[in-house]
Regions:
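Membrane-interface helix/loop caps of multi-pass membrane proteins
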Residues: 1-168
Length: 168
């Protein structure tokens, strides 16, 4: 959870710094994220593939392949949420299970700069209230949902990112 708070803080800080210096560009923002995240993700995947091939049974290998695709396209949080753990391999045989949080984070990185710039430019003096409202909405949403959705879907995690944004 603190990981998402930290990300909200860092990303909003980077965006504001770039705006204040007159050098924010979406392209540069996303290229920096790609250079920071993809090498570690692809290293993990490259190291996992041979072990998965050697150690997993056909059903587990199929699940691994699906989780690999979902990890590369940053929707592993949705993939693992919809996975039937009762009929699937053990979590111990899912080497990319930890990428659920990367999926949430990347979804935030894709959406947040656009929303942030809209609110920051139009409502600069009131943007903190808007981000606080998003934080409250996410907390209320958590209170109304008693399923695993709270763990895997970004709307239930937004309060953590927004807390980081508001700390900034």
């Amino acid at each position: 959870d603190i990981f998402f708070v930290r990300s909200g803080y860092l990303i909003s800080n980077i965006i504001i710094s770039d705006i204040n210096n007159g050098k924010f560009k979406f392209r540069h923002f996303y290229l920096r994220r790609i250079r920071r995240i993809l090498p570690a993700l692809f290293s993990t995947i490259i190291l996992s593939v041979p072990f998965a091939y050697i150690l997993l049974q056909p059903k587990g290998l199929l699940e691994f392949s699906r989780s690999l695709i979902s990890s590369v396209f940053f929707y592993s949080n949705l993939y693992f949420r919809n996975l039937d753990f009762y009929n699937s391999s053990s979590a111990k045989t899912m080497p990319l299970l930890h990428t659920w949080s990367l999926g949430i984070e990347e979804q935030f990185y894709i959406i947040f700069p656009i929303i942030f710039l809209i609110f920051f430019k139009k409502f600069r003096n009131n943007s903190a209230f808007i981000f606080f409202a998003i934080l409250l909405f996410s907390i209320l949403l958590n209170g109304t949902n008693q399923t695993d959705d709270k763990f895997y879907y970004i709307q239930f995690r937004l309060w953590e990112f927004m807390l980081g944004v508001l700390i900034m």
